[in-house]
Amino acid sequence: MNHPATSGEAPDVNGSGRLSLGDPVVLILSIGFIVAFLALSLYDVTLVADSISKGFAWTALALGSYFQLLLLLTFFIAMGLAITPAAKAKIGNLDAPEMSTFKWLSIILCTLLAGGGVFFAAGEPVYHFIVTPPAFSSEAGTPEAVSNALAQSFMHWGFIGWAVLGSLTAIVLAHAHYVKGQPLQPRTLLYPLLGERLMRGPLGGIIDACCVIAVVAGTVGPIGFLATQVSFGLHEVFGLPNSYTSQLVILAVLASMYVLSAMSGVHKGMQLLSRFNVFLALAVGGVIMLFGPSLFLFNSYLSSMGVYISEFFPMATITAETAPAWWMQWWTVFFFAWFIGFGPLVAIFVARISRGRSIREMIVAVAVLAPIATTVWFTLLGGSGIYYQMTGVIELSEALNNFQFDVATLTVAQALPGGAWMTLAILVLTTIFVATTGDSMSYAIAVVGAGHDDPSPYMRAFWGIAMAIMAAVLLYMGAGQISALQQFIVITAIPVSFILLPSLWDGPKAAYAMAREQGIID
């Protein structure tokens, strides 16, 4: 395994042992953020929530269009690059992949689907069904609204969001690290622009810390919400207590799962969890298609994909000038900023697990196949929710107008074939989705601290435990602080977006450089 050997490399915990937790600037700023957020929340929870809410609203209004443009450009440049001869270049100095295609795709899908697969797949399409999105004029709650509702969900969790997670940025990082010997850190994305002063000085650590903080904010949210969702589900279905103690037990089980998985590495726990989850998701989907409203779901998927494609640009470019500002803030801009916040660290992870794959394989997997799988999953759960809402089996209007997506998920699950058993299966599926995000992000943060792709298992465990503790403290204060932390990722997307920006031109340059080095092009 090729580790970087430049003088700008972050401290190697495995080699020197000088720093057990990696780059001191990244460590101090990232842990400082966690401590400061918790301390300020304990001191004045309302002040913190209100301050984040104001920053969230300003960011969405002032920079929402910029975020949308960044995602669009990333997707189309990546797609253009994928059809060039340079896309034949192999990643990571390996001629053959380290793992099978199924294992590789399973890890990619499970790692990145947690936010959507867990909390929005059942509820978001139903919400857009009962509250017509501004890009459409169909009457809410009618058959004409079905395709539009699903298409809007596809836009939020589809091609352009996924593309920013591991296409152009992953190419830049893979070339810089595995070929040029630069550290596997977000700062490396800016190396072509700022040079050695960035790699050697504290500015590089600040850049890395911004990306770590964004991922912590984005990962702690699902971890905390999972505890509330599973606790609520077990109470509703099996009558178990829905209390803070129950949430702590669920958190402990979840943290044990993803910490042990992260410590065992990509080829052991991480891929085993992902494979199991994919098999379980296929089983759940099979039951829904066999015994649920299968014809409705099949027809809805086809028509919704048609609407998604035909209305792609109107949905992708709608702004607060033509849509209600609150809607843009809480939907399109929120999700796009979420993807941006995760971008650099997920790109590190994708670059690591894609060694031996071609650039074309990586782009197609991340920006095409994974989004298509996501749209299928949203149709299975959300489409079923729409069907049961239309036929009067369930009533989610009040819950969704109050953004109670945990209630929506459980309500839809209980209406599906299998009743309590299906609900239990979806709760298990939900838990493993979050665990696969927890283990991959614990690993990715540790990689940032170490600067290479084999960080100490103890560093991985440290970050996994730190995020679980943060979730536990925030749950003690109330689920509102988890929501506030999730809103904070929109604010962190500001610096992270500028870190991603140079990849629009550096990604193709790196791909062509790799292709020339491998003799694919002249």
Q: Over which residues does each language-model region extend?
A:
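Flexible loop linkers connecting adjacent transmembrane helices
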Residues: 7-17, 50-56, 83-102, 126-151, ...
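Membrane-water interface regions at transmembrane-helix termini and the short interhelical loops
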Residues: 12-19, 45-59, 78-98, 149-157, ...
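Extracellular loop-to-transmembrane helix junctions
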Residues: 25-31, 58-74, 105, 147-178, ...
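Membrane-embedded translocation segments of transport machinery
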Residues: 198-206, 211-357, 364, 369-423
